[in-house]
Regions:
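Short glycine-/acidic-enriched loop or helix-start segments at secondary-structure transitions
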Residues: 1-2, 27
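Short, well-structured alpha-helical interface segments that form or flank functional binding sites
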Residues: 3, 58-62, 135
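Conserved catalytic/acceptor-binding region of the Class I
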Residues: 13-78
Length: 146
């Protein structure tokens, strides 16, 4: 992000990033392993994707700080996903993906992850689950020179 931000600022261009995941996830109903699984997913998102370590859930706050440091006017706002039982396909894809990331990171045992995933899928199949996934939109623009 630093190289992109430096180039944008050097050209005095505006910058907009939509739906930057910020690490906030809440489940209804909750499960004792939610925080551990989501923590593992956040660690997974920070892994090197071929360009060095990724920012993962820190991307929005780092982007805000970077543009403020170069004198840009920055506006940001929550743009959370709120997924309800009728969003079942998306909910299933999310919990499956989070479980997969947790398995790759290896901070929890495979039986713990399987138990968490079974609990989440069961709640989804009975339409008793909703999830809020925190995102932030960021707009940055150079302050006009006089």
């Amino acid at each position: 992000m630093t190289a992109t931000g430096t180039e944008v600022a050097a050209r005095r261009l505006p910058f907009y990033a939509a739906l930057s995941y910020d690490g906030r996830i809440t489940f209804e109903p909750s499960d004792p392993l939610d925080a551990a699984i989501i923590g593992a997913d956040s660690d997974h998102q920070r892994r090197d994707k071929g360009f060095g370590p990724a920012l993962g859930p820190d991307a929005a706050k780092r982007t805000i700080a970077m543009f403020e440091a170069v004198g840009y006017f920055v506006v940001n706002a929550a743009a959370d996903w709120v997924l309800r039982p009728h969003d079942r396909d998306m909910l299933v894809a999310l919990v499956d993906g989070w479980a997969s990331a947790a398995r790759e990171v290896g901070q929890q045992s495979l039986p713990e992850i399987a138990t968490w995933l079974t609990h989440r899928r069961d709640a989804l199949s009975h339409e008793k689950s909703s999830i809020r996934v925190g995102h932030i939109d960021v707009f940055a623009a150079p302050i006009a020179r006089r």
